Design a protein with these regions (language model features):
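Nucleotidyltransferase catalytic core that binds NTPs
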Residues: 1-174
């Protein structure tokens, strides 16, 4: 069977949604691997008025843009509202989600099934993180840093620097 070449008409665009507060090496692992699977990957930062993020939307976007620069087929965007509506607006065919543990799976399965109910043509692709990041979350990174622990190797150097600036009161140059 001859190889099928993907044309722009059949572009496989995926959305990788999240709060990315802060961006971790686990997120970057999924971005790198997702960039190899999809023709285009849109890393989409959720604007959630109900959450009080550590980093502003602009700060998170800038950090993500700086970190995904090496990937030609990855771009950063923001959204609010229903993910399925946003995905359809962007003409995405898939949502990329990371699953670290059974607890993630239960939640993500529920979300994927609801998304399928709302938008049957939108697929959810679950990806396991590299083993080194299977326990890593933004919440843990913030807690470790707040308590004086090292986050080296858990987040990119840029993010570690921004955490220092946030927690120690020096102005960020974003």
């Amino acid at each position: 069977m001859p190889a099928v070449r993907n044309t722009n008409l059949n572009l496989v665009r995926a959305i990788y949604p999240g709060s990315f507060d802060p961006l971790t090496n686990g997120h970057l692992d999924l971005i790198e691997r997702g960039s190899k699977i999809f023709d285009e990957l849109i890393v989409s930062i959720l604007r959630n008025a109900e959450k009080d993020p550590l980093f502003t939307l602009a700060e998170r976007r800038k950090m993500l843009e700086d970190m995904v620069r090496p990937y030609e087929n990855v771009r950063v965007d923001t959204f609010e509202g229903l993910l399925v509506d946003y995905a359809m607006e962007k003409k995405a065919k898939a949502v990329l989600r990371g699953i670290r543990a059974i607890s993630d799976y239960e939640y993500e399965l529920q979300m994927a099934l609801m998304n399928r109910k709302l938008q049957p043509q939108l697929e959810t692709v679950f990806m396991m993180p590299a083993e080194a990041y299977s326990y890593l979350s933004s919440r843990l990174v913030k807690e470790i840093f707040r308590l004086g622990g090292s986050v080296r190797g858990l987040v990119p150097e840029l993010v570690e620097q921004r955490l220092r600036e946030k927690f120690h009161g020096t102005a960020a140059t974003i």
